[in-house]
Amino acid sequence: SKSPLWGRFMKKVSISKEDLEELQNQISGLNNDIITKDENLKELVNELDKIQNVMDFQGEDIVSIDAVPLKTWDLLSKAQVVINNGSTSYNFPIDKHGQGTQSVAAILLFKAYVKILLNEMSREEAEAILTLEEPEAHLHPQAVRSLHKSIDEIECQKIITTHSPYFIQNMDLKNLRYVRKENGETKIAKIFDRYVFSVSDIPEGLIRLSSRFSNVIEVDGNLNIVTIKDPINRCLEGAIRGCCHPSDETIDAVIDNAYRIFNMAEICNLNTYVQRSRGEILFARKWLLYEGQSEDVILPYFAKILGKDFDASGVSGIIYRSNGSAGPFAKLAKVLSIPWVMLADNDEQGRQTVGEVRNCGYSEDVISSQVLLNSTTDFENELATSNRIFTDYESIVVEEITQDIIELKNSGDVDEYKKEIVKLVQKGKVVNAYKLLDLWSGNALSADDIPEVYVNAILGVCE
């Protein structure tokens, strides 16, 4: 009620003359009822009425007591928002509630004020602008998500800064502006689904290319504007470079932005993952990407053994395989300039992952240094290259080892024996990952027990 916005809102109150007179009479009647219902107040009025004997005032009803403001506008000036949370019979003014409740009330007040104000505007193009700094402060997660819905319903331009993954988890990622410091300079990045650039003289080759790939490239010869509507690949990059002749710097910028375009499927995959992870990945300083849940369980423990901590280092782990593919995350990291390291299996699927990263426009040098392949086919087999971890494998699946598997070991067929043990572990990957952690809690690994590829990945994001 002390907010300037509240005062502006109250000034918008409009009551007709007839209704105002009726209210005025009701208020006067209420005031008179209050006075006459109490003997002490009546006696006080009678005593004060004697003032005319001293001051020589003329007329009747010289003295009265205003128990309530007698003017409607005086009454409105004392209006305030009161809230009862339902647990008591008391109504408390909004300024006696917590910061979170006050913030929500202020935003909803703005919502109502904007609606009234815009209805009074004669220009159809009139639009309000709402700027909010960390509206999630002092609110629990469910309240933050509910607040986001209320803000989203406000019909105006909204500029909001937030540090809450809960606030952004249901937003359209294309509305996101990602702000970060880079070498002392503030950088702002965004996700886009097309890239538009102008060319002073559109080459014939580009026009022919747009005819052949109309789903990707659109040319407006009248405005000399080229629109790339879908992410390009290496082949299309070569074709664009071949038919355009601006400076190398200009064409490089065009190609770089064309690789950063997100198609609808990629945006849907990212939206789904952000909702699952509560948007946490967008606040991380670095990403460690891996294929499955087993890595999600075990890699933080490996980091601890190496004297590192993912949370302290600002690292978010991302399971890319169960959320579409690696490509959208590699592209998002490029768009937002988030450093990353990716782990991939050394199999056909792993090679497919490398191809997805390559199609995001990364150089071969970046791919070879940031996409780390297991020396074996997958995570469980890679862990089995460590003698200590393989021994632990045997311990956690001991009840499932059959006589046939034991005979493989006794006959000296070590490779086949290891394969069978790994298969048993893989039958319950996640459960067995937790069994390993439980085992290691009493008998910790050493850094030498961790396969080299995971040491390199962890140090790559934590240093």
Could you tell me what each predicted segment is?
Residues 5, 47, 106-109, 146-150, ...:
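Alpha-helical scaffold elements adjacent to nucleotide-binding pockets in ATP/GTP-utilizing enzyme cores
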Residues 14, 31-42, 134-138, 320, ...:
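Generic amphipathic alpha-helical segments used as scaffolds and interaction surfaces in large
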Residues 77, 100-101, 125, 153-155, ...:
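Short, well-ordered loop/turn elements at secondary-structure boundaries
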Residues 82-256, 260, 264, 268-272, ...:
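Switch/communication elements of ASCE P-loop NTPase nucleotide-binding domains
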Residues 207-289, 293-463:
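Acidic, Mg2+-coordinating catalytic modules of nucleic-acid enzymes
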